[in-house]
């Protein structure tokens, strides 16, 4: 009888230790804050350089600048900045190093209104590109300014 009592006690103690180990503690790192697309763009804007449409146009007139349109191909076909290169936002990380191998290239990124451009510019900087700017207002602002389009 004593033997069964000890066994029962040992089992209860063992289960107590196991279950006690399943609880969370305050020492564990807090889960990262969930962010919306708007939050991600706002965070990216803090880490990139943005230029106005007129500044971007001045860059287009200079040699040595690459305009990177990060919209989808069907958007690009409907009109784009002259001589712009199209690399959709979703393929940027997998494609850009083949199309723009020199990390010192002067790059002006744009999308339709600015969100994808900000994210793309931030990604390029994180990938080691040193001279990246996002065109504030994107394609909509370029078109509204009456600048040339292809």
Language model region names:
Residues 2-6, 10-13, 22-65, 74-106, ...:
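Rhodanese-like catalytic fold shared by cysteine-dependent sulfurtransferases
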Residues 67-69:
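Structural scaffold elements adjacent to functional motifs in cytosolic proteins
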């Amino acid at each position: 009888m004593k033997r069964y009592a000890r066994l029962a006690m040992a089992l209860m103690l063992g289960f107590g230790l196991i279950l006690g180990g399943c609880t969370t503690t305050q020492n564990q790192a807090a889960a990262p804050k969930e962010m919306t697309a708007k939050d991600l763009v706002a965070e990216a804007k803090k880490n990139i350089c943005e230029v106005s449409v007129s500044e971007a146009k001045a860059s287009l007139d200079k040699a040595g600048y690459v305009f990177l349109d990060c919209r989808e191909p069907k958007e690009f076909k409907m009109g784009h900045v002259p001589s712009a290169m199209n690399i959709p936002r979703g393929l940027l990380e997998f494609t850009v190093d083949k199309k723009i191998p020199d990390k010192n290239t002067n790059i002006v990124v744009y999308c339709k209104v600015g969100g994808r451009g900000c994210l793309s510019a931030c990604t390029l900087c994180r990938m080691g590109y040193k001279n990246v700017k996002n065109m504030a207002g994107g394609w909509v602002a370029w078109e509204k300014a009456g600048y040339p389009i292809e």
